[in-house]
Amino acid sequence: MKITLIAVGTKMPSWVTTGFEEYQRRFPKDMPFELIEIPAGKRGKNADIKRILEQEGKAMLAACGKGKVVTLDIPGKPWTTPQLAEQLEAWKNDGRDVCLLIGGPEGLSPECKAAAEQSWSLSPLTLPHPLVRVVVAESLYRAWSLTTNHPYHRE
């Protein structure tokens, strides 16, 4: 199973890239974890946000292909680390690749939300999208470590 984080936005601050890559490199070869960045639509005073969201959503879903779509969204289900570890095992047993979608400044398109088989909430707070990349990478690595009895996670 491959996990792909599909996120709107490019040119992240160096701390985001460093943090994400630190956890990305720790994933085992049998569970590759990759990042696909979708360029954000041009936003300005007269921007058509609905159209921008639609374009970003189409690009995200195209990048996912036939993978299981999981959105990262405030109304999603909050998981504890042990619950996320269970989800990781369920995703592996499903046999499909998993695509985790992080929207842009206005969130995810209605098409992305409709395509989602699951929705995961990291917090009831609105988090900066760059920070979400790092939090997701660390959370997934921690969940993996729990499933393999790796000493990274401690209760």
Curated annotation (Swiss-Prot):
It is an enzyme of class 2 (transferase). Its EC number is 2.1.1.177. InterPro entries: Alpha/beta_knot_MTases (IPR029028), RlmH-like (IPR003742), tRNA_m1G_MTases_N (IPR029026). Disulfide bonds: none annotated. CDD domains: RlmH-like. S-adenosyl-L-methionine binds at residues 72, 103, 122-127. GO terms for cellular component: cytoplasm. Its main location: cytoplasm. Homodimer. This is Ribosomal RNA large subunit methyltransferase H.
